[in-house]
Design a protein with these regions (language model features):
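Alpha-helical subdomain
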Residues: 2-89, 198, 203-380
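Conserved Class I S-adenosyl-L-methionine-dependent methyltransferase catalytic core
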Residues: 9-16, 22-55, 65-66, 72-202
């Protein structure tokens, strides 16, 4: 199963023209700098001012006057953005306030610029990359060599994984992390709930429940279900407070601990075990270990649901690209040994623990999640 053919011919053919290949290579050479150019345009408000100017556009001189940034500063950012297709030069340059021969003319927002400014998916990814990944990525080589998240040290030396650090991150970084984490899975919840509740489970275990969003969605969806959130102490503390504020303190319980720790005992009698964007936090070997612990705590009637964005099951190449990039976050920041998985390798790791794949659902939500339904093998 792990050798199944990928669904995009892009991964197999190399038909790109040499001149186009060179262009792409040159873009890669400057990506770190061009990324920061766009960040500067966003955080100074310059990109928004250009957008607000509409089809007539706005000159570098006007942008400088409005922002208090030198014409030089505005100019170098604008020229880079032109080269990236983020900005365009207005065809209505007779309206420009800067008539000097050296003027670029009026700048207008291009389609790429619109997505950087307005598209929530792009903004979440951009902020996550800048606030969580960018500085730590300089340690990617060491992370690859050592099998440890060497980039995490940019936030401090007290943690071995990012999950232990979450509650201690600065507010901006914490906000970017949680917005990234929630943005993807939250969009799939409306389609996931009918799948999980098809058999009307009474007891649901949410392993890796994080802030409790899924658990609270379950309580709203089914008035009779009880949910147990199993996660690290920092996360269960936050989830418990959120559950209390939502009025679900009597329907959501909490088990604090590391599921990989032999001393962490899972509760029993689950009708459903749910793991959303949780297993990608572990290596394949660790996934098998976690599922073995689950295997020993559930009976043959329990349904295991795993929701993950599998990069080889995405509808569009850009989504696969984003997931492949997210794998590098796991390598240098999160834990040093996990990634965003392919369908076959994830199924194989889970089945090694004694489960069989019963059913799979793909392309759920705007971000194309998969839900994999497993049950215990009759004869392990």
């Amino acid at each position: 199963m792990s050798n199944m053919k990928l669904n995009n011919d892009f991964y197999y053919n190399d038909k790109i023209r040499a001149i186009d290949a060179k262009e792409e290579a040159l873009k890669i050479a400057f990506y770190p700098i061009t990324f920061q150019a766009i960040r500067s345009l966003l955080e100074t408000g310059l990109l928004q001012k250009i957008s607000d100017a509409g089809d007539n556009g706005i000159s570098v001189k006007e942008l400088s006057a409005q922002s208090g940034i030198s014409e030089y500063g505005v100019g170098v950012l604008a020229e880079m953005a032109l080269g990236m297709g983020v900005l365009k030069i207005s065809s209505q340059n007779e309206n420009t306030a800067d008539t000097s021969k050296s003027s670029l003319g009026n700048l207008v927002l291009g389609k790429i610029g619109w997505f950087l400014l307005e598209d929530n998916l792009t903004k979440v990814n951009f902020n996550f990359t800048n606030d969580i990944c960018y500085k730590g990525a300089f340690n990617l080589i060491d992370s690859i060599k050592n099998g440890k998240p060497e980039g995490l040290k940019v936030f401090g030396d007290n943690w071995t994984t990012v999950y232990e650090a979450l509650s201690s991150l600065p507010e901006r970084e914490k906000k970017s992390w949680f917005e990234f984490d929630h943005f993807y899975s939250d969009a799939a919840f409306p389609e996931a709930l009918p799948i999980v509740f098809q058999k009307k489970p009474k007891e649901l275990f949410d392993i890796g429940g994080n802030t409790g969003k899924w658990a609270m969605n379950c309580c709203r969806y089914d008035k009779d279900v009880h949910v147990s959130i199993i996660d690290l102490p920092g996360q269960t503390n936050v989830a418990e407070q959120n559950a209390k504020e939502a009025g679900f303190q009597n329907r959501i319980s909490f088990v604090s601990g590391n599921v990989l720790d032999v001393n962490t005992k899972l509760p029993e009698n689950a009708d459903v075990v749910w793991m959303s964007q949780f297993l990608d936090c572990f290596s394949l070997h660790q996934i098998t270990k976690i599922l073995t612990k689950i295997y020993n705590s559930v009976d043959e009637n329990c349904d295991i649901f795993v929701m993950e964005p599998l990069w080889d099951m995405q509808k569009f190449p850009a989504e696969s690209y984003a997931l492949q990039a997210t794998s590098l976050y796991f390598t240098c920041i999160a834990n040093g040994n996990s990634k965003m998985y392919r369908f076959g390798e994830l199924v194989e790791a889970i089945e090694k623990a004694g489960f069989s794949l019963v059913q799979s659902h793909h392309n759920l939500g705007a971000n194309f999640y998969s839900i994999l339904n497993f049950r215990k093998k009759v004869n392990k």
